[in-house]
């Protein structure tokens, strides 16, 4: 009985330390708070030469993270 209480206390302490230290939750790695109302279109290209228009830079960065892509801004206007 005492052993299970001690193990429970250790588990709770470990959990609270993780929360207090602010260790990142891997499931929220790509969550970025983009202003979806902000329309500052950009043209971006990836390593393969593909181009894509994004609503704004934040949206591009978020999609890069979610899709494991590598688009980089090449201009401050829509792609041709």
From Swiss-Prot:
Residues 24-80 form the Kazal-like domain. GO terms for biological process: establishment of protein localization to extracellular region; imaginal disc-derived wing margin morphogenesis; positive regulation of canonical Wnt signaling pathway. The keyword Secreted applies. It is found in: Secreted. GO terms for cellular component: extracellular space. Disruption phenotype: High pupal lethality, a significant reduction in the number of chemosensory bristles at the wing margin and narrower distribution of wg. The record marks 36-37 as: Reactive bond. Disulfide bonds join 30-65, 34-58, 43-79. The keyword Disulfide bond applies. Residues 1-22 form the signal peptide. Keywords: Disulfide bond, Protease inhibitor, Secreted, Serine protease inhibitor, Signal. One of its GO terms (molecular function) is Wnt-protein binding. Strongly expressed in the developing fly wing but is excluded from the presumptive wing margin. It comes from the Eukaryota. Interacts with wg; the interaction facilitates short-range diffusion of wg. Increases short-range diffusion of the wingless/wg protein, enhancing its signaling and expression of target genes required for wing margin morphogenesis. May act as a serine protease inhibitor since it possess the Kazal serine protease inhibitor signature. The name 'pegasus' comes from the mythical winged horse able to carry Greek heroes over long distances. This is Protein pegasus. The gene is peg.
């Amino acid at each position: 009985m005492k052993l299970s209480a001690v193990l429970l206390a250790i588990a709770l302490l470990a959990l609270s330390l993780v929360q207090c230290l602010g260790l990142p939750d891997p499931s929220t790695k790509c969550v970025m708070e983009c202003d979806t109302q902000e329309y500052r279109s950009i043209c971006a290209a990836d390593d393969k030469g593909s181009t894509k228009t994004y609503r704004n830079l934040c949206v591009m960065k978020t999609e890069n993270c979610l899709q494991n892509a590598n688009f980089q801004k090449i201009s401050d206007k829509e792609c041709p």
